[in-house]
């Protein structure tokens, strides 16, 4: 499950390292990561009775965590890759449907109409790569980057995902705070390298608290910034391989 403003193409290296696994990467440009569980499951295209291993990066971590906590019988293994924290609840006036959200959406539509994303979108993508990855190696072709990040409605899509992630974080926070009857084996990968080093202490503490609540394990990645799937795809693949055999991985 990708994170905010990410694409399925970015996870190609992880998929390549798992040739014996049935890996499904949901496309956030078609199905918002903050969608309900039924929508996400349909987007993954897995059989209704299939038992899953779920992997989520950034806000995708919140999405798979909600899935695992609300439907524990469907999930056999959970991997959170530098997941957003349940404390990242944003500002309520900007939650979906609230006045702030409506104002930002109107602005994003206007910028799309006058061509701002079309001109600046690919540059924003390059900035994301520079700040979020130590390797800085972008797996997207220029054409794909232009199509996705230079799309008229791309900034509206990014905002909708961000605002939706705040609401999702608030929901998952309540789930984590409540007594947890059942949770699948959970692994957390935490990036503290590159630009992530500036907030590493607090970030790692938050991730450890989340791991404690889930009875999960934490692996710290000092050689990776936030975009772990670009810097350390091998670490993600190795953690996934510890999952129960013959699982669908979404």
Give the location of each predicted region:
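Residue in the alpha/beta-hydrolase core beta-strand immediately N-terminal to the catalytic nucleophile
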Residues: 53, 76-79
């Amino acid at each position: 499950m990708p994170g905010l403003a990410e694409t399925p193409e970015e996870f190609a290296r992880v998929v390549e390292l798992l040739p014996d696994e049935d890996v499904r990467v949901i496309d956030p440009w078609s199905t918002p990561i903050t969608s309900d569980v039924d929508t996400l499951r349909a987007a993954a295209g897995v059989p209704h009775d299939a038992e899953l291993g779920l992997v989520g990066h950034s806000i995708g971590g919140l999405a798979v965590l909600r899935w695992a906590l609300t439907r524990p019988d469907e999930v056999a293994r959970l991997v959170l890759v530098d997941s957003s924290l349940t404390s990242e609840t944003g500002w309520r006036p900007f939650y979906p449907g609230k006045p702030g959200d409506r104002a930002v959406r109107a602005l994003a539509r206007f910028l799309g109409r006058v061509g701002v994303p079309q001109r600046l979108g690919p540059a924003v993508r390059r900035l994301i790569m520079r700040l979020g990855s130590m390797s800085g190696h972008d797996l997207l072709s220029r054409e794909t980057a232009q199509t996705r990040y230079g799309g008229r409605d791309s900034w509206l899509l990014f905002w909708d995902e961000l605002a939706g992630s705040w609401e999702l974080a608030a929901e998952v926070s309540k789930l984590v705070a409540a007594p947890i009857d059942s949770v699948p084996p959970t692994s957390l990968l935490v990036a503290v390298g590159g630009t992530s080093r500036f907030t590493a202490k607090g970030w790692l503490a938050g991730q450890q608290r989340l791991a404690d609540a889930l009875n999960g394990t934490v692996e710290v990645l000092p050689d990776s910034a936030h975009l772990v799937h670009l810097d350390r795809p091998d670490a993600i693949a190795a953690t996934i391989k510890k999952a129960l055999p013959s699982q669908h991985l979404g």
